[in-house]
Design a protein with these regions (language model features):
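Alpha/beta-hydrolase fold catalytic core
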Residues: 1-17, 38-41, 76, 80-81, ...
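Conserved HGGG/HGGXW glycine-rich cap/lid loop of the alpha/beta-hydrolase fold
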Residues: 5-56
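Active-site loop/oxyanion-hole signature of alpha/beta-hydrolase fold enzymes
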Residues: 34, 43-86, 247
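Flexible "cap/lid" loop of the alpha/beta hydrolase fold
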Residues: 100-101, 106-136
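Conserved alpha/beta-hydrolase catalytic His-Asp/Glu region
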Residues: 120-122, 139-194
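Short beta-strand/loop motif that positions the catalytic acidic residue
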Residues: 196, 202-204
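Conserved alpha/beta-hydrolase "acid-adjacent" motif
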Residues: 209-215
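Catalytic histidine-centered segment of alpha/beta-hydrolase-like enzymes
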Residues: 233-246
Length: 266
């Protein structure tokens, strides 16, 4: 089972589950925990091969569905029937896959630095990465990707946070995660269609230039999706602008909880 950590107020308090991206760990949410645990039960998960979760869990043919199922196993272990899910970067794909395969377990999705389609630039970058992944030290590739995705000086803290976490991931694990990106665009397109019934908020840094255009397009087509740009922020907006990220996410969860509340009659 995946390594996890919980902060629980009471059984009646809504749960919020945090899912980090590839190369990260649950520690990337350090600027969210204090604020969220005030009024929410919090579940932090280390995805396979990351943080304190076991390595070598991969089987041939594993997909995002298998990874999302492992998160559901943690929910079962803790006794969480429903949860709001907050994902970051590639973790947003895991979050959306959970919503697709287990819609009754996901109250809402809050997707930061969301990846819903790779454009020609990111596809070319991934193609080069796949071609050299077994010959080039993975940290060199990861640093390169980090600088391309988070190029500005003001992104330095978030960039270094992800690079430092990635150092703890073995090369074989990195290669496995990297391989999941092959032929992923059709899968991502299907996810945007199949999860429209789940309330979804996209939180994107205004400087997340690689991934914003597809978000704008999908939000125009789906009235149930909401999209907010966070100023002075890049791809990892929960670290670049934590106060803004936290307020927007907490307000959204409160709105969903209010909609779901049962009002007694009489």
């Amino acid at each position: 089972m995946l390594h996890y950590r919980t902060y629980e107020i009471s059984p009646e308090t809504p749960w919020v589950t945090f899912i980090h991206g590839a190369g990260g760990s649950s520690s990337v949410w350090f600027k969210q925990i204090r604020e969220f645990r005030k009024k929410h039960n919090v579940l932090l998960v280390d995805l396979r091969g990351h943080g304190q979760s076991a390595r070598g869990m991969w089987k041939k043919g594993d997909t995002f569905a298998d990874i999302s199922r492992e998160v559901i196993e943690v929910l079962d272990e803790v006794g969480i029937k429903e949860t709001h899910v907050i994902g970051m970067s590639l973790g947003t794909i895991v979050a959306q896959t959970m919503a697709d395969n287990f819609p009754g377990r996901v109250k809402s999705l809050i997707l930061g630095g969301a990846i819903i389609r790779f454009d020609i630039r990111t596809k070319l970058l991934l193609l080069v990465g796949r071609a050299v992944k077994r010959f080039v030290p993975y940290m060199l590739l990861y640093r390169l990707f980090a600088y391309i995705i988070m190029p500005r000086k003001e992104h330095e803290e978030s960039r270094m946070a992800f690079v430092n976490e990635a150092k703890k991931v073995y090369q074989k694990e990195f290669i496995r995660w990297f391989s999941l990106t092959k032929l992923i665009n059709p899968y991502l397109t299907r996810l945007q269609i199949s999860t429209t019934a789940i309330p979804t908020l996209f939180l994107m840094g205004e400087e997340d230039y690689l991934f914003i255009p597809p978000i704008e397009e999908v939000v125009r087509k789906n009235k149930g999706f909401e999209f907010i740009k966070i100023e002075k922020s890049g791809h990892v907006c929960n670290i670049d602008q934590p106060e803004v990220f936290n307020k927007l996410a907490i307000d959204y969860i409160a709105k969903i909880e209010q909609k779901n509340a049962v009002i007694p009659i009489g």
